[in-house]
């Protein structure tokens, strides 16, 4: 079972990835 911290970090990483993709596009 993932801890809340791990889940938050995963979500943040995904959001940053999307932001980077949009900036580079």
Curated annotation (Swiss-Prot):
Reported modifications of this chain: 4'-phosphopantetheine is transferred from CoA to a specific serine of apo-ACP by AcpS. This modification is essential for activity because fatty acids are bound in thioester linkage to the sulfhydryl of the prosthetic group.
InterPro entries: PP-bd_ACP (IPR009081)
Coiled-coil intervals, chain numbering: none
Keyword tags: Cytoplasm, Fatty acid biosynthesis, Fatty acid metabolism, Lipid biosynthesis, Lipid metabolism, Phosphopantetheine
First-listed, main subcellular location of the protein, grouped into a coarse class: cytoplasm
GO biological process, one term: fatty acid biosynthetic process
One term under GO cellular component: cytoplasm
Localization in the cell: Cytoplasm
Pathway: Lipid metabolism; fatty acid biosynthesis
PROSITE patterns: CARRIER
Domain (Carrier) ranges: 2-25
Cited function: Carrier of the growing fatty acid chain in fatty acid biosynthesis.
Family recorded in the similarity comment: Belongs to the acyl carrier protein (ACP) family.
Entry protein name: Acyl carrier protein
Organism lineage string: Bacteria, Pseudomonadati, Pseudomonadota, Betaproteobacteria, Burkholderiales
Gene for this chain: acpP
